């Protein structure tokens, strides 16, 4: 039997996932993180992106995260997300439109603040599209 740990993925709206998993992959503030059983304790910010969950029996699930916090403790991992959406629930047309608007905003931005806001929106839209693509490929 594979080594496992307990994972909770919680957003402000709902608990997205709670169960036993083999591993997760998530975008931390310092880069990509792979968490497996017996990982060292850790607390880090999460960038907009996805969490790839490998469940207890090997099934995979992908969830979009708009940002948040990851806490790793012995035997348990908690993700507190600003927003969490299952890949199958994302709307590709809306994500493409958000990407287009963010790119247009970046091209017309006047100043660092406008550019930073547009850049953050673009990163979220690209992350959603990536999750949609991975979800489609898994089906």
UniProtKB/Swiss-Prot annotation:
Predominant location: membrane
Gene Ontology MF annotations: ATP binding; proton-transporting ATP synthase activity, rotational mechanism
Protein function: Produces ATP from ADP in the presence of a proton gradient across the membrane.
Family: Belongs to the ATPase epsilon chain family.
Cellular component per GO, a single term: proton-transporting ATP synthase complex
Entry membrane topology: Peripheral membrane protein
InterPro entries from the UniProt entry: ATP_F1_dsu/esu_C_sf (IPR036794), ATP_synth_F1_dsu/esu (IPR001469), ATP_synth_F1_dsu/esu_N (IPR020546), ATP_synth_F1_esu_C (IPR020547), ATPsynth_dsu/esu_N (IPR036771)
Quaternary organization: F-type ATPases have 2 components, CF(1) - the catalytic core - and CF(0) - the membrane proton channel. CF(1) has five subunits: alpha(3), beta(3), gamma(1), delta(1), epsilon(1). CF(0) has three main subunits: a, b and c.
Protein name (Swiss-Prot/TrEMBL): ATP synthase epsilon chain
Organism in which the protein naturally occurs: Erwinia tasmaniensis (strain DSM 17950 / CFBP 7177 / CIP 109463 / NCPPB 4357 / Et1/99)
Subcellular location: Cell inner membrane
Superkingdom of source: Bacteria
Database matches in HAMAP family: ATP_synth_epsil_bac
Keyword annotations from UniProtKB, A to Z: ATP synthesis, Cell inner membrane, Cell membrane, CF(1), Hydrogen ion transport, Ion transport, Membrane, Transport
């Amino acid at each position: 039997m594979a080594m496992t740990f307990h994972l909770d993925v919680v957003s402000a709206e709902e608990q997205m996932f709670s169960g036993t998993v083999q591993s997760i992959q998530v975008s931390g503030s310092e880069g990509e993180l792979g968490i497996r059983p017996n990982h060292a304790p850790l607390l880090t910010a999460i960038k907009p992106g996805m969490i790839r969950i490998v469940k207890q029996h090997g099934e995979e699930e992908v969830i979009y995260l708009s940002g948040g916090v990851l806490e790793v403790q012995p035997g348990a991992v908690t993700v507190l997300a600003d927003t969490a959406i299952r890949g199958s629930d994302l709307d590709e047309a809306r994500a493409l439109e958000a990407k287009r608007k963010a790119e247009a905003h970046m091209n017309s931005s006047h100043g660092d603040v406008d550019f930073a806001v547009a850049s953050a929106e673009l990163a979220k839209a690209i992350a959603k599209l990536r999750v949609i693509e991975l979800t489609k490929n898994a089906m």
